[in-house]
Curated annotation (Swiss-Prot):
Annotated Gene3D superfamilies: Peptide deformylase
Catalytic activity: N-terminal N-formyl-L-methionyl-[peptide] + H2O = N-terminal L-methionyl-[peptide] + formate
GO molecular function: metal ion binding; peptide deformylase activity
Cofactor binding, note field: Binds 1 Fe(2+) ion.
Co-factor requirement: Fe(2+)
GO biological process, one term: co-translational protein modification
Name of the protein in its database record: Peptide deformylase
Binding site for Fe cation: C91, H133, H137
Length: 152
C-alpha cells in the first residue's frame, strides 16, 4: 500500500465529475487500499477518489475512534435525505481551513461494496455529514461552496 498525493484547492481537477465504476477489479481494490492508507496517514475521516486525482465514484470513510471500521462506498447514490444539522467541516484538500456547513441530518444511500454487492445504508449525525461531504467531491463540489460571502 502507499500514501497517495492529495489534490489541494484551488486545483481545477477537484471540480471534475467522477464516473461510475463498472468493474471492481484488482486495480480498483488496490486504489481503495491506498485511499484508506492516505486517509489514515493524513488523519482524515473521509476521502473521495477525486481528491487523489482518480475521477471514479469511490469514497472511503472511517469515523471510528480507533480508525478500524472503514466504510467503502462505490457508486453511492442518495435515496433520501431529511432534517437539518450543522457541523464544522474540514477537508484534506483544503488544509487548515474549517467552516460550519448546514446539511441533512439523516441520509439513506445505495452503494456497492468491494465484493460488488449492492447495499443500503441509513446514517445520521457525523456519518451523514461525512457521506454528504464526500459525495459532493464526486460531483466537483467542495464544502467552501456552501459558505455565504460576507456582506459589507
Amino acid at each position: 500500500m502507499s500514501v497517495l498525493s492529495i489534490l489541494n484547492y484551488p486545483n481545477k481537477k477537484l471540480r471534475k465529475i467522477a464516473s461510475n465504476i463498472s468493474l471492481i477489479d484488482s486495480e480498483i481494490k488496490s486504489l481503495i487500499k491506498n485511499m484508506l492508507e492516505t486517509m489514515y496517514f493524513n488523519e482524515g475521516i473521509g476521502l473521495a477518489a477525486t481528491q487523489v486525482d482518480v475521477h471514479k465514484r469511490i469514497i472511503v470513510i472511517d469515523i471510528s475512534k480507533n480508525k478500524n471500521k472503514p466504510l467503502i462506498l462505490i457508486n453511492p447514490v442518495f435515496i433520501n435525505k431529511c432534517g437539518a444539522q450543522t457541523f464544522e467541516e474540514g477537508c484534506l484538500s483544503i488544509p487548515k481551513k474549517t467552516a460550519f456547513v448546514n446539511r441533512s441530518k439523516k441520509v439513506k444511500i445505495k452503494a456497492i461494496n468491494c465484493l460488488g454487492e449492492e447495499f443500503l445504508l441509513k446514517s445520521k449525525g457525523l456519518l451523514a455529514t461525512c457521506i454528504q461531504h464526500e459525495m459532493d467531491h464526486l460531483i466537483g463540489k467542495l464544502f467552501i461552496d456552501y459558505i455565504k460571502p460576507l456582506k459589507n
